[in-house]
Curated annotation (Swiss-Prot):
InterPro entries: CaH_exchang, CAX-like, NaCa_Exmemb, NCX_ion-bd_dom_sf. The gene is CAX1b. Residues 86-91, 148-160, 216-232, 305-327, 386-388, 436-453 are extracellular. This is Vacuolar cation/proton exchanger 1b. GO terms for cellular component: plant-type vacuole membrane. The chain crosses the membrane at residues 68-85, 92-109, 127-147, 161-181, 195-215, 233-253, 284-304, 328-348, 365-385, 389-409, 415-435. It comes from Oryza sativa subsp. japonica (Rice). Residues 1-67, 110-126, 182-194, 254-283, 349-364, 410-414 are cytoplasmic. Keywords: Antiport, Calcium, Calcium transport, Ion transport, Membrane, Transmembrane, Transmembrane helix, Transport, Vacuole. The lineage of its organism: Eukaryota, Viridiplantae, Streptophyta, Embryophyta, Tracheophyta. Its main location: membrane.
């Protein structure tokens, strides 16, 4: 069956399946903070010209292209995807490939969120929630797996650490600061219950990172000479399994027993119709169409992520920046730009629960799911990746979680809290800017640091 015909028949079934799942307008549908954040970057597209196309199959195909490619404010960045592929095959400079690939990942990440939400219309709330949880940080997962395949453990660790720090300090800090300025005379309350759950899980994560680090120092100092040199690696693998168990319990807690804690308040009507996300309650793609597009977007994301991983050293040498700085600072900022922008937009509208759900939810997912999955996948590949992220990285993570927890304990925000978080991120960024690692691979477990003078 031709793809265009499949898409056309799939779209005719969309409304029937939506009725079956009680998801037509007028009936409530649970939407996570990630859904709402990504939706803030979507826009309506004029499809009136499509009605003049005589062929029904072609009209359906063009309608799908319109719904997937033109209903996002980031559609102008899609040419970067093709340019990155062309730059690779035409043997342009690797730095150009790196930059174009990073830019191309921005709209792809937003479209992956859109497509998983479309599929969730037909799968019900539980499976839809699992889909959103799985694809919420798919870019980080793909980059981590591809870097593991090339043995670049330092890139894996630094990129995941950078995503956590970026969500906790930069995204949340920017959102709180701009929300405080935009709503200077208004109260900015938020529900602390969700924040407490996420910070507790983040503290568990930093404990699992700290123990292998302390064990390595204990072994090298001779305090526990009876302990084998691989003890930290074995401990990391055990901790990773326990972290995944904790994450599964967190999903059950979030999607079943205490889902009311994670449901953002309904977005009220605003003057800007593009931000009325609560009205977006009807699928625009059929199930088959959404699955096809999801597979295509995932393949493109994997392709560009591979370009990023293979060219990061060239960018590091060209820009005279350490690989750790690019991985911790630049990759997370660009890779999650769409989601971060959505969090800031809702903060400006004083929808702080959505902003917290995006920033804390992403940090929790990366620390409790993506990181342990990376360790276990490396285990199956025979790669000795552990949870020892080195003293500087682990200390930065612990302090970031601590500052965030203290900032959110009152249940009300103002711009000074946001400014403090942003400045904390700036201090950490400067710290990683002034250091260089002598061993870029990081596969031997020994890391020497040089300070840029």
């Amino acid at each position: 069956m031709p793809v265009s015909r499949m898409m056309m028949e799939s779209n005719t079934m969309a409304k029937e399946m939506a009725v079956r799942h009680h998801l037509l307008p007028g009936s409530p549908r649970r939407r996570t903070a990630h859904n709402l954040s990504s939706s803030s970057l979507r826009k309506s597209s004029d499809a009136s010209l499509l009605h003049k196309v005589p062929c029904a199959a072609l009209r359906s195909l063009l309608a799908n292209l319109n719904d997937v490619l033109l209903t996002t404010r980031l559609f102008l960045l899609f040419p970067a995807v093709l340019l990155a592929i062309a730059a690779t095959y035409l043997h342009f400079g690797q730095v150009w490939v790196f930059v174009l690939s990073l830019i191309g990942l921005v709209p792809l990440a937003e479209r992956l969120s859109f497509l998983t939400e479309q599929i969730a219309f037909y799968t019900g709330p539980t499976v839809g929630g699992l889909l959103n949880a799985t694809f919420g940080n798919v870019t980080e997962v793909i980059i981590a797996l591809l870097a593991l395949r090339e043995g670049k453990i330092e890139v894996v660790k630094c990129s995941l650490l950078g995503s956590i720090l970026s969500n906790l300090l930069l995204v949340l800090g920017t959102s709180l600061f701009l929300a405080g300025i935009a709503n200077l005379r208004a109260h900015q309350p938020y529900d602390t219950k969700q924040a407490h759950v996420n910070t507790a899980l983040l503290m568990l994560a930093v404990l699992c990172h700290s123990l292998p680090l302390m064990l390595r120092y204990a072994v090298t100092s001779g305090d526990h000479a009876i302990v084998s040199g691989d003890a930290a690696l074995h401990l990391s693998r055990a901790c990773s399994i326990l972290m995944l168990i904790a994450y599964l319990a967190y999903l059950f807690f979030q999607l079943n027993t205490h889902r009311q804690l994670f449901e953002p308040q309904q977005v009220e009507d605003d003057d800007d119709d593009d931000l009325v996300i609560a009205q977006d309650d009807e699928p625009v793609l059929g199930f088959s169409s959404a699955m096809i597009w999801l597979a295509l977007m995932t393949l493109l994301t994997a392709l560009l992520s591979g370009y990023v991983v293979s060219t990061i050293e060239a960018a590091s040498e060209s820009w005279e920046l350490s690989v750790s700085f690019i991985s911790i600072i630049l990759l997370p900022i660009v890779g999650n730009a769409a989601e971060h922008a959505g969090a800031v937009i809702f903060a400006l509208k004083n929808k702080m629960d959505i902003t917290l759900g995006v920033s804390l939810g992403s940090a929790t997912q990366i620390s409790m799911f993506v990181v342990p999955v990376s360790v276990i996948v490396a285990w199956t590949m025979g790669i000795p990746m552990d949870l020892d992220f080195n003293l500087l990285e682990t200390g930065s993570l612990f302090l970031a979680i601590l500052v965030t927890a203290f900032t959110l304990q009152e249940g009300e925000s103002h711009y000074l809290k946001g400014l403090i978080l942003v400045l904390c991120y700036a201090v950490i960024s400067v710290c990683f800017f002034v250091i260089r690692r002598r061993s870029a691979g990081g596969t031997d477990g020994v890391h020497h640091l040089d300070v840029i003078v």
